[in-house]
């Protein structure tokens, strides 16, 4: 495939089949060779900054026309836009993945079943990962790098709005990895290819969608392949009665304003009634100065109307606001009677993504953190910390709000599964069955697989 868009003669089915074949070889590629390939990807991206920017500028120009037509938001275009510094950050991200410990071949458990009968639980790649993402061309590189490091083949389907950017970045990856099994990374571009991908449950082991809540929901509803992702990021910050209000103002500002377009930005601010007047007088001025639109419940509106030092205008919040991921400089505010009410509100309207309590009372914080149902729950910290890099996981492929396999920011570990290796010496099950069955030891011990004899 060329940058200019020459049609790839392979069908989506053929590409997935090739990826399935490549996955078997890729799982046995040494750590050193995978890391060398990742370093080569970073170098190739840096050498092609002008080529990448040219393609991205064309994508952005088309997207800006869609903003004018009311089809896209400016936040959507912001996610699409690349810059020299952002491309440099992408290259550094790839290098950071290369520098991480190998997630493969780790012995999670070693258990002696009997003399010379030892069981090992060892990490292995998942296999073939299909990913469908919107607007962010950097996601293509991020997902490819993490897939390569974890020994997985990957099928990449980006949005048409980033077609040129995705194509150039994909070609950079292929140019950098001639020593990696052919077919390990595949780019599909046609809209109808998405449905093909979702139907190939015999070849694709995991689907990772990244995009709007409706988009992710569509993927979940139209495949029998396991889906790792989240439909939306309706994150809350609760300002408790025992909060340090100066801290609370700073954290709530960061959680909304630092980068409002991402899924870990706060969308709803809950405020205990005892501190609401004093807190809102500080908070609303800061939000106004940052251009944040405020939508408040009746109690919030009443405080604004009665407090002489609050001059900001607010919009009446509707029921829909409590379940909306704005992805923009908009925040909804509700005043609550108690900590329990805050917890109940979050568990009713939240998306199980990231929630935060601001309080100086550790007992109240513990109650909140135990009771709130979310992948990440914070105490006195911005919701924006819900990120694989900030968690020390390296780059992430996304955030999962599910509870099976992986939860929260998903890095390399989330792209592996495990295999059981049993090392024996001719043992038979009959020995351990019947009236005179030999008992198992089931004793865990410290040893890694593979086990090497002294003579090699």
UniProtKB/Swiss-Prot annotation:
NCBIfam families: PRK00197.1 (NF001221), proA (TIGR00407)
Pathway recorded for this protein: Amino-acid biosynthesis; L-proline biosynthesis; L-glutamate 5-semialdehyde from L-glutamate: step 2/2
Organism: Haloquadratum walsbyi (strain DSM 16790 / HBSQ001)
Positions in coiled-coil regions: none
EC number: 1.2.1.41
GO MF term (any one): glutamate-5-semialdehyde dehydrogenase activity
Gene Ontology CC annotations of this record: cytoplasm
A Pfam cross-reference name: Aldedh
Signal peptide per UniProt: none
Identification of the protein by name: Gamma-glutamyl phosphate reductase
PANTHER family the record matches: DELTA-1-PYRROLINE-5-CARBOXYLATE SYNTHASE, GLUTAMATE SEMIALDEHYDE DEHYDROGENASE
Chief place where the protein resides: cytoplasm
One example of a Gene Ontology biological process annotation: L-proline biosynthetic process
InterPro entries per UniProt: Ald_DH/histidinol_DH (IPR016161), Ald_DH_C (IPR016163), Ald_DH_N (IPR016162), Aldehyde_DH_dom (IPR015590), G-glutamylP_reductase_CS (IPR020593), Glu-5-SA_DH (IPR012134), GPR_dom (IPR000965)
Catalysis: reaction(s): L-glutamate 5-semialdehyde + phosphate + NADP(+) = L-glutamyl 5-phosphate + NADPH + H(+)
PROSITE patterns: PROA
Subcellular locations according to the entry: Cytoplasm
Keywords: Amino-acid biosynthesis, Cytoplasm, NADP, Oxidoreductase, Proline biosynthesis
